[in-house]
UniProtKB/Swiss-Prot annotation:
This is UPF0435 protein YfkK. Keywords: Phosphoprotein. The lineage of its organism: Bacteria, Bacillati, Bacillota, Bacilli, Bacillales. Pfam families: DUF1128 (PF06569). The modification Phosphoserine is found at residue 57. The gene is yfkK. Belongs to the UPF0435 family. The keyword Phosphoprotein applies. The keyword Phosphoprotein applies. Transmembrane segments: none annotated. It comes from the Bacteria.
Amino acid sequence: MSSPNTETLTQMIEEISQKLNMLNVGVIKAEDFSDEKIEDLTYLHRMVMKKESFSPSEMQAIAQELASLRK
């Protein structure tokens, strides 16, 4: 059974991936992030969900931030 934090992480990652139209969504999984990073991921999620569109450099920066938050 998954924890509420894992479910929250999964939902946020899926929403970020959809918003950014990431083609390789399977590469980013909730299991790759520790519960300790949920606050940082929540901040990133809020920022992504507020914007309508992203420049290529913004998308790259977001992808790099996601990578830095991984375990």
